Regions:
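Acidic, PIN/NYN-like endoribonuclease modules and their adjacent C-terminal/linker elements
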Residues: 1, 13, 21, 119-160
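Short, well-structured N-terminal submotif of metal-dependent ribonuclease cores
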Residues: 1-39, 45-60
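Short His-Asn-centered micro-motif
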Residues: 4-6, 40-41, 95, 115-117
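A generic structural signal for well-ordered alpha-helical segments
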Residues: 32, 58, 105-106, 136
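Residue-level detector of structured alpha->beta connecting loops
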Residues: 36, 62, 107-110, 140
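Domain-start "cap" segments at the beginnings of catalytic or binding domains
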Residues: 37-40, 45-86, 148-150, 158-159
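Active-site neighborhoods of divalent-metal-dependent phosphate/nucleic-acid chemistry enzymes
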Residues: 70-134
Length: 160
């Protein structure tokens, strides 16, 4: 079971148009309806703000949006501390507050995170420069993270 972040959903929407890849979107809707695919309310808000037609499609598909609980907010703060971020001084090349909430949501629900943020093969010299996949790979965070294409390949689904 997976949680999508905004980058992956917008990537899918922009690169696999519904009219040209209807089988893919029927399958994604089925995954949503089976509750195998969800989104943090934070990521959903980002999708709706940036790509309203995709947001509308997700609502129509019945997407379950996972709320940010006190436990999730506290875990996001813990991760923020691991990154050495003080106050609102997030590094422009690293994760932001919403990203931490999305990671903490996936962690709280024991879900794999699907993110299309850039992979960093070598962790940056400054932890606050880490992107979502790199933060997820930290031992103290330990959230499995894959990108959209890996998600599709691993599913074994065939779209005709």
């Amino acid at each position: 079971m997976q949680v999508f972040d905004a980058s992956s959903m917008i990537y899918a929407w922009d690169n696999y148009p519904v009219d040209q890849f209807p089988g893919l979107w029927i399958w994604i809707a089925a995954e949503i309806n089976a509750r195998r695919l969800m989104m943090s309310i934070v990521a959903s808000g980002e999708v709706c703000a940036g790509t309203p037609d995709c947001g509308d499609w997700l609502v129509t598909a019945g997407l379950e949006r996972l709320d940010v609980t006190n436990e999730i907010a506290q875990d996001a703060m813990r991760i923020k501390g691991l990154l050495g971020v003080v106050g609102d001084n997030y590094h422009p090349k690293g994760v932001g507050e919403n990203d931490l909430l999305i990671i903490a949501t996936a962690r709280a629900h024991g879900r794999e995170l699907i993110s299309n943020e850039a992979q960093q093969n070598n962790p940056p010299d400054v932890n606050s420069k880490r992107k979502i996949p790199s933060v997820c790979s930290m031992r103290e965070v330990a959230v499995p993270c894959i990108d959209f294409v890996q998600y599709i390949r691993r599913s074994g689904a065939v779209f005709r």
